[in-house]
Amino acid sequence: LRAIWFGHSSVLIEIDGIRLLVDPVFSKVVSPVSFLGPKRFHPPPIALTDLPKIDAVIISHDHLDHLDKTTTQYLAAKGTFFLVPLGIGAYLKKWMIRESQFIELDWWESCKVGQVRLICTPARHYSGRSLFDWNRTLWSSWSIIGTKQRVFSSGDTGYSDHFQEIGRRFGPFDLTLMKVG
């Protein structure tokens, strides 16, 4: 089990020989207009073009700082598969990503990448990419179950009883990626 943090919420996880990239954001600015919106303080520690082959991308929700259009399109062009919460597939289709390259999951639904089981689990948050589309897509955390190790990625979340339920169903976890702030 290995994990490399690339800043903010972007993490590369390697488990059972499978490389998973969580909420990849490699753009300098994540905004519909380049002069507004969240901006990186520091460049990522690796260029997007220097990443190793990624088996799957996991997206927690549709906020601009978690679902980066430019990064997503680049990875999709490389043939990368995406696991996303319900509703986010509409963005991927709009960005010309083939439906065969992604799966949308509801809370408690899962799929496998190799021998690794990925479960879309609850989070206490909200969604939306503008002032006019709040809560039209699902937000999530993710439980990642390998043959011997387990990872929990919280996504953006507040504390709630969902942590106990996730831990009861899928824990204990060997690595927890908890978003703070």
What residue ranges belong to the model's regions?
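Glycine-rich, N-terminal phosphate-binding loop of Rossmann-like dinucleotide-binding domains
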Residues: P24, T121, V180
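Structural motif
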Residues: I18-L20, A56, V116, Q149-V151, ...
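Pre-active-site segment of Zn-dependent metallo-hydrolases
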Residues: L1, F6, S10-D62, K69-Y74, ...
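Active-site-proximal loop/helix segments of hydrolase catalytic cores
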Residues: T70, H125-G181
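A short helix->loop->beta-strand "cap" motif at the edges of active sites that frequently abuts
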Residues: A77-T80
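Metallo-beta-lactamase
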Residues: L1, V84-Q149
